[in-house]
Amino acid sequence: MANEQNEQSQDLSSEQTTQDHEQTQTEGVEQGAEISVEDLKAQIGKLEESLKLEKARTANAVYEAEKVKERAEREADTAKKFALEKFAKSLLDSVDNLERAIQAAGKEKTPLLEGVELTLKSLTTTLEKFDVVSVDTTNGFNAELHQAVGIDPNAKSGEIGNVLQKGYTLSGRLLRPAMVTVGQ
């Protein structure tokens, strides 16, 4: 019987130990749960900050990419405009020759003269489509657009007397200055 009581005592002691152990585990889990929640909240805060930082970096990268794209488009437009410069300069000689042919023909309208005039008109229209336009010589002498090659005694001071050769610009940039005579 003492043996039975001893076994019952051990069983009770074992049950008590098991209950204490379970209670300790439950408290540990609860404390662990509290710590885990706090840790998770801290991690969430860190992740939110990291997300904000990455969003800002992404927005900055998108902004920079747009700026690079815009600059490349501008440079391509500029290159396209001025890539025609050498070609346009070559065509100006043809325009000059056609104008000289028209002047040399006189006032008599012949089919040949009409053909030359139509060719000149077609060529100048094509040049204007690509923003190649003649320099204005009606508003007086401008050293940036005109080259004075002589003096015209009949013209007023600062005025253009005769235009010896037309000047041209390409998209506002001077291709060739107008060769003119000016008054004293």
UniProtKB/Swiss-Prot annotation:
InterPro entries: GrpE (IPR000740), GrpE_coiled_coil (IPR013805), GrpE_head (IPR009012). Keywords: Chaperone, Cytoplasm, Stress response. It is found in: Cytoplasm. Gene3D superfamilies: 3.90.20.20, Head domain of nucleotide exchange factor GrpE. It comes from the Bacteria. Signal peptide: none annotated. Its main location: cytoplasm. Pfam families: GrpE. The keyword Chaperone applies. GO terms for biological process: protein folding. Residues 1-35 are annotated as: Disordered. One of its GO terms (molecular function) is unfolded protein binding. GO terms for cellular component: cytosol. Participates actively in the response to hyperosmotic and heat shock by preventing the aggregation of stress-denatured proteins, in association with DnaK and GrpE. It is the nucleotide exchange factor for DnaK and may function as a thermosensor. Unfolded proteins bind initially to DnaJ; upon interaction with the DnaJ-bound protein, DnaK hydrolyzes its bound ATP, resulting in the formation of a stable complex. GrpE releases ADP from DnaK; ATP binding to DnaK triggers the release of the substrate protein, thus completing the reaction cycle. Belongs to the GrpE family. NCBIfam families: PRK14150.1 (NF010748). This is Protein GrpE. It comes from Acinetobacter baylyi (strain ATCC 33305 / BD413 / ADP1).
